[in-house]
Amino acid sequence: MKNDLSFEVVVIGGGHAGCEAAAASARLGINTALFTHKIETIGEMSCNPAIGGLGKGHLVRELDALDGVMGDVADKSGIQFRLLNRSRGPAVQGPRTQSDRSLYRKYMQEKLLNYCNLSVFSDPVIKFIFNKNTISGFETNSGKKILCGKLILTTGTFLNGLIHIGDERTPAGRFNEKPSTGLSEQLEKYDFKIGRLKTGTPPRLDARTIKYDNLEEQFADEDPYFFSFLTKKNLNKQISCRMTYTNEKVHKIIQKNLKRSAMYSGSIQGVGPRYCPSIEDKIVKFADKDRHQIYLEPEGLNDHTIYPNGISTSLPEDVQQEICNNISGLENVKIIRPGYAIEYDYIDPRELFLTLETKKIQNLYLAGQINGTTGYEEAAAQGLIAGINAALSFKKQEPFILDRSDAYIGVMIDDLVTKGVAEPYRMFTSRAEYRLSLRADNADQRLTNKGIEIGLISKEREDIFKDKEKKLGIISKIMGESLISPTKIKSFNIKIAKDGILRKSNEILTQKGVNMKKIREIWPEIPYFDKKIDEQIEINAHYRGYLKKQKADILAFKRDENLVIPENVNYDDLSGLSNEVKAKFNQIKPKTMGQALRIDGITPAAVYILLSHVKRKSIKLIA
């Protein structure tokens, strides 16, 4: 064995979870190492060349508010910025960008390879080192023995990964890249519940062989909505995407060849993502539809590769070619690389604490697709939380937990560790009970101070954030003191009830058609700082009434939700609970009443029995 190396925190895996985990740990001043198969694939976008979207964009803004790396890299590599749901309210709008795949990888690598407190190694891990129920290090392919205080495992689709193209099966973690083998089997010895999930990707097409003439064009937004609160301007030329559709002939080709699909031949055992189905699944499950939309997304400014979003498949390559050649615009298209399905191991996330440390092995943290999620953004958000908590734990500080009213990150992690997954988990705005307050626009106001408190935030970001808060405070104070009567406001063509009650300017701002420009016509003493500050004031005013009620709901809920469940509760002795409920409580061991309530299959009645028991015990202790 070669000379030992020792680090305080080690991250295994250089995907989106691994990048955020390593960066977060390093930002907290911890001597951190990142181990990956290849340094040149750090930050690789394995599937679609895009970041963000509905729910996902919120996660990236929250990552950025906590000084994560994904938002900045997405902005620097963005080649088509679009704000989804722009016509709807800010609570459900989703920032998204098409990224240049090579630029994204380049900027992520530049960032991490120059990150303070972070060392990066290209050396696959082959064996963990355990000391009873504690992980203490690992051995690498080159024969190195690495010791660590905390270990974060972010293997993505590499854990016993298996690629399917028709009846061909190839062990791989990604196209032309070897999987991680043997690691699952080591964890299995500690009775981890390990399952198989599946995801897929479409064939890559040669843009030079596509006829674009009659295809609908989708343009970038003229006024880009960036992911990072620090980004001031767009760096890249903005491009268009094109749209085309499947048709009845294509559907017949797929139906005729279903048995040749790995999905329908019985080759694949893993469950795929419901919200990102293969084209085979679409044809079978939505047989009434005569066409399905396909977005032709360029993979880069200097790249001829097109990602046809909407036709993920595990059909044989010859069938993929036939399908493509019967789609409008793709009649003569050349496939650069076939689409495929990939199966991989995941660990039941109910095996984790909210810190993402495993319950069965101390000092071992899991983040990303190994926890049953799908998507770059979901992985990155978990990486951030695992990295923060591994570092804080090493420093013997309190854990960093975001709850469901704090962030979409908190919603996701709570869902994972309490409910587990039956299919790859994807974030949506509908998953958040408090989505009116968990908006993309206010992620910094919700989270940056929390990051400052634990030493996670850079001086640059802290200064910019505090300056923004100061400006918002100045305007809010003046507007809270500026009053006007219904009679006087009428002269400005603003209609309100003639009830003689004076209104504050922030109340007037909630009226239809009123913006900050109009407000300054009435109160010219209100200072103007910049467009972003005005937009934030307008959004805050719009949601003011709703948020006041929601805040009361959150406080009421938290009174019982945050009630801690003693570790010594004997669920088997609680009368009124079914054996199934007792088994779930014993398996998950919820820390709080709120966590108990969100366990899949647990009824409010069962939680009430537990709540009554905990409160009775508390009263006895006080007495």
UniProtKB/Swiss-Prot annotation:
Q: List the InterPro entries.
A: FAD/NAD-bd_sf, GIDA_C_N, MnmG, MnmG-rel, MnmG-rel_CS, MnmG_C, MnmG_C_subdom, MnmG_C_subdom_sf
GO biological process per UniProt: tRNA methylation; tRNA wobble uridine modification
Q: Where does NAD(+) bind?
A: 272-286
| GO cellular component terms attached to this protein's record | cytoplasm
Q: Which UniProt keywords apply?
A: Cytoplasm, FAD, Flavoprotein, NAD, tRNA processing
List the SMART domains hit by this protein, alphabetically: GIDA_assoc_3 (SM01228)
Q: What positions does the entry give for FAD binding?
A: G13, G14, G15, H16, A17, G18, V125, S180, Q369
A Pfam family it matches: SAM_GIDA_C
tRNA processing keyword on record: yes
Necessary cofactors: FAD
Which Gene3D superfamilies does this entry report, sorted A to Z?
Answer: FAD/NAD(P)-binding domain, GidA associated domain, C-terminal subdomain, tRNA uridine 5-carboxymethylaminomethyl modification enzyme MnmG/GidA
Q: GO MF annotations for this entry?
A: flavin adenine dinucleotide binding
Query: Does the record carry Thylakoid as a key word?
Result: no
Q: Where does the record place it?
A: Cytoplasm
Q: What role does this protein play?
A: NAD-binding protein involved in the addition of a carboxymethylaminomethyl (cmnm) group at the wobble position (U34) of certain tRNAs, forming tRNA-cmnm(5)s(2)U34.
Q: Please describe the quaternary structure of this protein.
A: Homodimer. Heterotetramer of two MnmE and two MnmG subunits.
The Swiss-Prot or TrEMBL record describes its family as follows: Belongs to the MnmG family.
Q: Which NCBIfam families match?
A: mnmG_gidA
Q: What is this protein called?
A: tRNA uridine 5-carboxymethylaminomethyl modification enzyme MnmG
Organism placement in taxonomy: Bacteria, Pseudomonadati, Pseudomonadota, Alphaproteobacteria, Candidatus Pelagibacterales
